[in-house]
Amino acid sequence: MSPLPKRALLAITSYHGPFYPNGDNTGLYYTEALHPYTVLTAAGFQVDLASETGEYGIDPHSVTKTALTDADALVYNDKQNDFNQKLAQIKKASDLDPTAYGLFFASAGHGTLFDYPKAKGLIAIAESVWARGGVVSAVCHAPAILPHIKDQATGKSIINGRTVTGFTDKGEVELNLMDKIKELGLVPITQGAIQAGATYKEPEGAFDVFTVVDGRLVTGTNPPSAHATAVKAVEAFEKL
């Protein structure tokens, strides 16, 4: 059994401004936080939700009838649900004690491309978890934070020399968003990973369930992979 606290920090993007070509805002991809939260709490973790600024917004594209299963929709529409209550009372990362956590899980949404690379409070928590031998995990666009999480022993990113996945360039093209990402000067997940010295892997289909486990580093490719990524993160924690 791990000597680390069985407490997880579930990171949420604080950016919820304009992004989509039609003018829609982006933000948190709802199920990429809901599904990991469900897995982590079922595994006995205490889970705190935090963003860099203590604010959040939900990407409207993530809560459409096509994006949510019937079970997800029931949760989303139940404002008294424990997850929704915690989301409504989201914490500011810099107000938290990094040493309280043994697992760091970064949820996603395109908002993460804006704020995660410079989210000093969230990065500090992840660096503490990593330095103490804990698990760092991220899904979909959340690996945008990984190049900026430093290994205190090497001074390099924790993904340097490791294998990761994350949302694919192919997926951005399928969603007709790659041009917008480039226009805004944002860094696609693939590019950020490779620049940080990681080996990037991807599934055959952009929305196939796909995860990569490299020791204490656990990543997933897309929204359908959020549940499986959290399951793998719990398994990695239990092996510590």
What are the residue ranges of the model-derived segments?
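Short, thiol/selenol-centered motifs that function as redox-active sites or metal-ligating centers
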Residues: A138-P143
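Extended, subdomain-level signal for the structured scaffold at the beginning of enzyme domains
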Residues: M1-R132, I145-L240
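Active-site cofactor/cluster-binding pocket
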Residues: V135
